[in-house]
């Protein structure tokens, strides 16, 4: 009975996560395809959104199948330190790029509300691509910092799950610092956006009186 329950859960998780991954790949791929196809849609904010979609696309296309291989299906050949470090690095990279991209969109929203036409005349597609480059650079640095302590001494044929757990444990002192920094920045930006919106509302109300 326990074996049947375990098999059922494995199949359920496999099908469910595969469906989510397929949905994410198709959805984000559609966003990227539309922005790439129509030149008039290649605007400053849309380029930032496209980069967010790209990070999500890679996360679903690469990291989800990898997770299914080592954690759900538990294939015997997916073992060793090298595969563990590569999979953890890719997961960290795409996750951090995703978070940084969302922060960049918050910054874009704040500047658009705060500076109006001055900001609209300043931002260009060329600057958007530079910001995208910075986002990937920041994501890469954060991923490297998280995976710095990869010097784990385990058996050669240890599973990827075991290696990743050991590497993650060694990176725990760094992870909370990085995550806390992102959370603080997001909260501050959200507060600044809210304050700017309230200020604009007061200005509009003043002119209408």
Regions found by a protein language model. Give the residues of each.
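Loop architecture of class A 7-transmembrane GPCRs
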Residues: 1-2, 74-92, 120-122, 140-185
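Transmembrane helix-loop junctions and nearby membrane-interface residues
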Residues: 32-35, 64-74, 110, 143-154, ...
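Class A (rhodopsin-like) GPCR signature focused on the TM5-ICL3 interface and adjacent 7TM helical core
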Residues: 101-113, 146-154, 175-209
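Alpha-helical transmembrane segments of multi-pass membrane proteins
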Residues: 20-21, 51-64, 92, 96, ...
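Intracellular signaling interfaces of 7-transmembrane GPCRs
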Residues: 37-47, 109-131, 191-209
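Extracellular TM2-ECL1-early TM3 structural module of rhodopsin-like
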Residues: 6-14, 18, 45-105, 112, ...
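Alpha-helical transmembrane segments of integral membrane proteins
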Residues: 9-13, 47, 127-134, 174, ...
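First transmembrane helix
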Residues: 8-38
């Amino acid at each position: 009975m326990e074996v049947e329950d375990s098999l059922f859960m494995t199949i359920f998780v496999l099908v469910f996560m595969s469906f989510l991954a397929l949905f994410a790949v198709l959805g984000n791929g559609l966003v990227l395809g539309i922005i790439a196809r129509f030149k008039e849609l290649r605007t400053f904010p849309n380029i930032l959104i496209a980069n967010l979609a790209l990070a999500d696309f890679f996360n679903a296309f690469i990291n989800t199948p990898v997770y299914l291989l080592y954690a759900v299906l538990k294939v015997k050949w997916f073992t060793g330190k090298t595969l563990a470090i590569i999979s953890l690095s890719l997961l960290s990279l795409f996750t951090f790029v995703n978070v940084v991209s969302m922060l960049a969109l918050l910054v874009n929203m704040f500047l658009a509300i705060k500076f109006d036409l001055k900001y609209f005349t300043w931002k260009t597609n060329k600057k958007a691509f530079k910001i995208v480059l910075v986002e990937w650079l920041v994501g890469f640095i954060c991923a490297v910092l998280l995976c710095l302590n990869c010097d784990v001494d385990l058996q050669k044929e240890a599973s990827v799950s075991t290696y990743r757990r050991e590497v993650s444990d060694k990176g725990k002192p760094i992870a909370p610092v990085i995550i806390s920094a992102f959370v603080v920045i997001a909260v501050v930006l959200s507060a600044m956006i809210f304050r700017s919106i309230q200020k604009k509302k007061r200005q509009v109300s003043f002119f209408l009186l």
